[in-house]
Amino acid sequence: VTDILGREVSVPQDAKRVICMYASTAHIMALLDKGERIVGASDGVTRDQMMVTKYPAVADLPTPYHEGAVNAEEVLALDPDLLLIKEEMYLKDNERQKLDDLGIPYVVVDYYDLDGLRKAIQVMGEVFGEEEKAQQYLSYMDEQFTYVEERVKDVPEADRPRVYHSITESTKTDIVDSLCAQIIHAAGLIDVSADSGLTDVGKNAMVTLEQIYNWDPDAIICNEYAVTDYILAQQKWSGLKAVQNKSVYTLPIGATRWCHHGSIEPQMAVLFLAKTFYPDRFEDLDLRETVLTYYADYFGMQLDDDTITKILSGKGMRESSPSLEME
């Protein structure tokens, strides 16, 4: 297969023991119905309730790398026949050398935007011989984007809500052309950080509270409910109009955090944001029904009402990281 960096990699025809050193690769494996083959994964995966429900063994998976550094002994102990890694790891000379020395095939799967996500899902489809399943999912993704974009395209710029997106930490936010900025734009919204030209080397950037006051967004959307609660409770955030108007929302969490740079479900975030900010234009969109059908069709899971409520509230589907820092 050819990975996202254009490397030609010979992979086992039917890889049975896979280590996912990038959380999103584990989520894509679940999408392709191959999650039972994961023998090691990033610790975030073990906190994802949907992964654990579908594949109970995930809860106890070891993480054979720490802070981006591969532990060769731990990798070998898991006897993997394939490693899935993120670009950042490959670009570190010492880590790449370690991977090469292991002699286990590794595929780089990573993304920064929608096109990158499409490519990542296609590459994973090829790795596991599930090209058709990957393509069906991508078609669904594109259909949802088009559905929303068509309905909001005539909203004048001046009438589009300006939103600030808090990614895991209150002052970590979107950069230009990132996956989350694309999600927010598709939903007919203005992303105050990305649209002000904010850039950084990674997938997001840290800003100051002063900067957020300068933007004074109409609404704030948060990836963690703990951050939503924090922003609403903190005196220093209370001068923002979004806080005064209680326009601070927690984003849903399903198989992945829908509006996160590691999301494999950006179309679901677009639907949620469209329904939240343009209820009149999306009166016929039943999010609960959509969620029910979507997880049945693409993840083979029959969700009960309680789980759908948790997904849409962003509460109870993922254990917060203990390192959740607040500004």
Model-derived segments and their meaning:
Residues 78, 194-250:
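A contiguous binding-surface segment within folded domains or other stable secondary-structure elements
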